[in-house]
Amino acid sequence: MFDLDQFIADLRAALAERSRQALKEVVARGVSDPASLLRRVGEPDQPAVRVLHQGPDLTVLNVVWAPKQVTLPHDHRMSAVIGMYGGREDNTFWRRVSNPTKFQIEPAGGRALGLGDVTLLGRDVIHSVLNPLTKISAAIHVYDGEFLTAQRSMWDAETLVEKPYDISAVTTGMPLHDAR
């Protein structure tokens, strides 16, 4: 049975250990039983970002992607762990171009995440996300900082020019809800 308070306590313990692997293991346990998790967070019926926990050293979000939804490239400036409990999330990773003549970033790989998959993102990672499915996808996103107010960047889809992060532009059509 997924217990949000215990999940947060386990994440805090992993943060205290300064172990990214321990964080990954906690998230893996959290998404290992999607039915139990869904009983706590609710069945995803529309795209949204729901805040499950927010603090200066830890933010936990329930992210529900619309069918075929794509985000702009963006960074977090903090480490993250993503755990899928429904559908799929395709991540494109980007790297800064050292001597840009046109674009400031370029593709540098990718990773498809499916049901039960968990991945770590380092604090300097730039990525964009696609839900390639014709149905909703859902994931728990854990950040080792105060994610919602952090100074971050995003890149314009057409020009790939860096600009200040605007959550509404990155997550178009995904309302932010406080689900605590």
Please tell me what each predicted stretch does.
Residues M1-S36:
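N-terminal leader/capping segments at the start of a protein or of a new domain
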Residues R96-I126:
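Short acidic-glycine-tyrosine-enriched beta hairpin
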Residues M78-V97:
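Glycine- and acidic-residue-biased ligand/ion/polar-headgroup-sensing regions
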Residues Q54-L58, Q69-V81, E106:
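A short beta-loop-beta micro-motif enriched in histidine and acidic residues
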Residues T71-H74, N91-T92, L121, H127-L133:
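Short beta-strand His + acidic residue motifs that chelate non-heme Fe in jelly-roll/DSBH
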Residues V81-G83, T134-T149:
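A short hydrophobic beta-strand segment most commonly corresponding to one strand
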Residues L38-Q69:
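A short glycine-rich, His/Asp/Glu-containing loop-to-beta-strand
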Residues G145-R180:
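Conserved double-stranded beta-helix
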